Amino acid sequence: LTNFVIVGGGPAGVEMAGALAEFCKYILPKDYPEYPSSIMNIYLIEAIDELLSTMSDKASSKTLTYLKDLNVKVLFNELVSDYDGSEVSTKSGKKILAKNLIWTAGVKGQFPKGIDEKHVVKGNRLKTDSFLKVEGYKNIFAMGDIAAMITTDTPKGHPQVAQTAIQQGKYLGETILNRLRNKPIKPFQYKDKGSLATVGKRKAVADLAKFKFTGYFAWLLWSIVHLMSI
């Protein structure tokens, strides 16, 4: 009952792992001194080799450091293959006893059969050009979570968040109409409003356009944005 397994190393998974770890480290010893904090184990399982894959390398590595400091057990390159309510199984054969499984990994990107796998990049995303056209095809487009428009400014593609899908959806609708009307089209321009993730008490990571920072000030910014959205 005291083992928690979180699946997915995106913002939701990272924030959940940080919150549970903070509870284990600070609240449990204070409110329940009869229970040692060692009885609570927190696992974060990620299918690829990094956390916060759509954020900067700095944000990813710092997040891992924060979680390790909080004694979160981070497992990379692991896929959950089964869960029977008591035990989590991964494709590599690992078994973790846990009554508490929290799924934050979302869903796997799906696309029609026939798409050449050489156009599929990390995260099962389709590589597109600057017009959101899938590379290697004339009339196949991709947008939202499944699209990866890789450029110098976005080496990992755009963030897999609602704002990206909204902007790309609007752009693609206008672009397809302009193509049908033989009108000139412009490449997609993403208006980056920044990415934030909190990793426990007074710790966070922030990617804001050309500015990337971590720690207390990133957490303070996250708190302000969160309060403004309520």
Q: What positions do the PLM features span?
A:
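FAD-site-proximal beta/loop scaffold in flavoenzymes
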Residues: 1, 86-89, 95-167, 174
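FAD-binding core/adjacent interface of flavoenzyme oxidoreductases
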Residues: 1-7, 12, 23, 102
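Rossmann-like dinucleotide-binding cores of NAD(P)H-dependent redox enzymes
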Residues: 3, 19-78
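Active-site flanking residues adjacent to catalytic metal/cofactor-binding acidic residues
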Residues: 7, 14, 45, 143-144
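Hydrophobic/aromatic beta-strand patches that form the interior of the parallel beta-sheet core
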Residues: 43-45, 75, 102, 141-143, ...
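A conserved short coil-to-beta-strand element within the FAD-binding core of flavoproteins
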Residues: 76-87
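C-terminal, flexible cofactor-proximal segment of oxidoreductases
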Residues: 164, 168-230
